[in-house]
Amino acid sequence: MLNPSRYRILAIGKTRKAWIQNGLNLYIKRLPGLTITELKDSDLKKEAQSIRSSIKTNELLIILTEEGESLTSLGFANRLKSLGSSRLLFVIGSANGLDSEIKAMANWSISLSPLTFPHEIARLLLIEQLYRAKNICEGGSYHRN
């Protein structure tokens, strides 16, 4: 079973759109223990420094990037399940992406889609997929094949 209290989402910039924040709040309630931390957006080097200082020593760094691995929802759920009791830090960069240093540090890079989305929407897509993965692993009815 997936344990959302082992997951953190680190996002550069603020969620400004109320409808996105409402969606995030909905899934946060469904995933007790999951936290989303917003860091100030800046130039890539400063953002990288903020990200580095936010990584805990026992966390696996998972970045969302267009060059990342494409997965189905089932594949994502199975991958999370295979990581067992690891603590996971999901990082969503700013509109300028992520610094190459952060990309090199990543334990896993994933792509939500070959399409480009605003970074606020990427947060909502990620948290929905985390909820879906948890539901898949628990045999729930939220995900339909």
Curated annotation (Swiss-Prot):
Compartmental location: Cytoplasm
Bridged cysteine pairs (disulfide): none
Recorded catalytic activity of this chain's protein: pseudouridine(1915) in 23S rRNA + S-adenosyl-L-methionine = N(3)-methylpseudouridine(1915) in 23S rRNA + S-adenosyl-L-homocysteine + H(+)
GO cellular component: cytoplasm
Any GO molecular function: rRNA (pseudouridine-N3-)-methyltransferase activity
InterPro entries xrefs: Alpha/beta_knot_MTases, RlmH-like, tRNA_m1G_MTases_N
PANTHER family in the record: METHYLTRANSFERASE, RIBOSOMAL RNA LARGE SUBUNIT METHYLTRANSFERASE H
Subunit relationships: Homodimer.
Protein name according to UniProt: Ribosomal RNA large subunit methyltransferase H
Protein source organism: Prochlorococcus marinus (strain MIT 9211)
Encoding gene (name): rlmH
